[in-house]
A protein has these predicted regions:
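Charged, amphipathic alpha-helical linker segments immediately N-terminal to NTP-binding catalytic cores
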Residues: 1-52
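Conserved nucleotide-sensing/catalytic segment adjacent to the nucleotide-binding pocket
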Residues: 41-47, 103-106, 110-126
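Phosphate-binding P-loop
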Residues: 63-70
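Hydrophobic anchor at the beta1->P-loop junction of P-loop NTPases
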Residues: 73-75
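P-loop (Walker A) phosphate-binding loop of NTP-binding proteins
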Residues: 78
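ATP-binding Walker
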Residues: 81
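Walker A/P-loop
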Residues: 84
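Post-Walker A helix-loop "phosphate-sensing" segment adjacent to the P-loop in P-loop NTPases
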Residues: 92-103
Length: 126
């Protein structure tokens, strides 16, 4: 994958593709990023991150993906490292530019607090 990202960064034709993709997804990506920022915690180098990392990654994913079968991509990292944010941005790019159907799921969608788990266990133990 590193070689693909390097190729995309160096190739003039791929730079044009990257720019074309960026122009199409920029508004949606920046709007999403803005919704995630707080006054104290602003994202740095937003456009650079999208153009230099996310778009090349999405080109790689799109080459691997088959519209007829599911293709799974996983992101791992500790709490608060940006997995949900990055996966949301990848989804925006893959759906808006590459016209792929994307289903994003987060482990946070399944997480319950200790109190919630205890409550649920009481219901199931009755």
């Amino acid at each position: 994958m590193v070689k693909i990202i390097q190729w995309i960064r160096k190739s003039k034709s791929s730079m044009k593709l990257t720019d074309k993709c960026f122009n199409k997804v920029k508004k949606n990506c920046l709007k999403f990023i803005k919704s995630q920022e707080t006054k104290a915690d602003k994202f740095k180098n937003k456009e650079r991150m999208i153009k230099s990392f996310l778009i090349p990654l999405c080109f790689w994913i799109s080459k691997k993906a088959d519209k007829k079968r599911p293709y799974f991509v996983g992101l791992a990292g500790g709490q608060g490292t940006g997995k949900t944010t990055i996966s949301s941005l990848i989804k925006i790019i893959l759906t808006k530019y590459f016209d792929l159907k994307v289903f994003r799921i987060s482990i946070d969608d399944f997480y319950k607090t200790r109190k919630e788990r205890k409550s649920l266990s009481k219901i199931w133990c009755l």
